C-alpha cells in the first residue's frame, strides 16, 4: 500500500502466493496502531492477514519498554491498550516532557517543530531513553512523503543524545520476531519484498534472507534504482517493477 491506497494488483499477488501454499508475513514499520488496528487497516484495503501474519515495529519496541513513567507520542485515536506501563500523552506542556522517565515515539501524526523543540530541550537538560518505534525517516504517501519518527530520532542524536534506540526495519529486533513466527523455514528460503534499499533490503540481507526490490511503486517510483544501488552499495537479489506485473 501507498498511504491509504492499495497498490494495484497487491490483492492478486497475495492470492497467488496463498494458492501456492506459501507462508506470508507483513513486516511493517507502521507503529501508529496496535495489532488489531494493523489488521483492520489491511482489511479496509481488501487484504486479509491474520494477527499472526502481521509483524510490526511497534511489537518490537513495546518489548523494550521498561517500568517507569513514559511520555508517549502517538495519535489521538491510539488507545495504547497494548502498552503495559504507566504513561502520559505528550502534547505541548514542557513540564510533562520533564517529568517522564523515558519517551516512546509511535507516530508523527500531530507532531510539529514546536513539540520537537520541547523534546530536544528536555533531553538536553536530562537525558533519558527514547524509543523510536518507527525507524523510517520518511514514508511515501498518496501526495508525497511524510516525516516519520526515525527522522526526529536522528535529530536528537545530532544534538548528542546517546539513549535513542530505533525499532523496525532495518534493525534486527523486528526481524527476529518474524523469524520466530517462521521457525521451521530457513532464512535463505525467505524472500523480502520492499521498496527501499536502506530498510527493507538492507535489513533482510543482514538476516540472510533473499531480497526483492520493487522499483515502480513506493520510494523509487519514477527513478532508476541501479544508480542508488551503486551509490549505497546495497544490492537486492532481484528487482521487480511491481509485485503483480
What are these regions (language model features)?
Residues 30:
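Conserved phosphate/oxyanion-binding catalytic-loop motifs
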Residues 1-22, 36-73, 77-245:
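Asp-based, Mg2+/Mn2+-dependent phosphohydrolase catalytic module
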Amino acid at each position: 500500500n501507498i498511504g491509504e491506497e492499495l497498490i494495484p494488483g497487491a490483492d492478486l499477488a497475495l492470492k497467488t502466493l496463498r494458492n501456492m501454499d506459501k507462508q506470508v508475513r507483513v513486516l511493517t514499520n507502521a507503529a501508529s496502531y496496535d495489532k488489531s488496528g494493523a489488521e483492520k487497516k489491511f482489511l479496509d484495503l481488501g487484504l486479509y492477514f491474520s494477527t499472526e501474519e502481521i509483524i510490526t515495529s511497534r511489537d518490537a519496541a513495546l518489548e523494550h519498554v521498561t517500568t517507569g513513567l513514559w511520555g508517549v507520542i502517538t495519535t489521538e485515536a491510539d488507545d495504547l491498550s497494548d502498552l503495559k506501563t504507566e504513561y502520559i500523552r505528550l502534547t505541548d506542556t514542557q513540564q510533562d516532557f520533564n517529568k517522564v522517565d523515558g519517551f516512546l515515539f509511535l507516530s508523527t501524526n500531530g507532531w510539529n517543530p514546536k513539540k520537537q523543540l520541547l523534546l530536544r530541550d528536555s533531553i538536553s537538560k536530562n537525558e533519558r531513553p527514547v524509543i523510536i518505534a518507527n525507524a523510517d525517516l520518511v514514508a511515501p504517501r498518496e501526495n508525497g512523503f511524510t516525516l516519520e519518527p526515525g527522522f526526529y530520532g536522528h535529530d536528537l542524536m545530532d544534538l548528542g543524545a546517546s539513549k535513542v534506540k530505533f525499532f523496525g526495519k532495518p534493525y534486527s529486533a523486528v526481524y527476529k520476531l518474524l523469524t520466530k513466527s517462521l521457525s521451521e523455514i530457513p532464512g535463505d528460503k525467505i524472500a523480502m519484498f520492499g521498496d527501499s534499499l536502506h530498510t527493507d533490503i538492507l535489513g533482510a540481507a543482514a538476516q540472510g534472507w533473499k531480497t526483492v526490490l520493487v522499483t515502480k511503486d513506493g520510494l523509487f517510483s519514477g527513478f532508476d534504482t541501479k544508480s542508488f544501488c551503486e551509490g549505497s552499495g546495497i544490492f537486492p537479489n532481484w528487482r521487480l517493477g511491481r509485485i503483480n506485473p
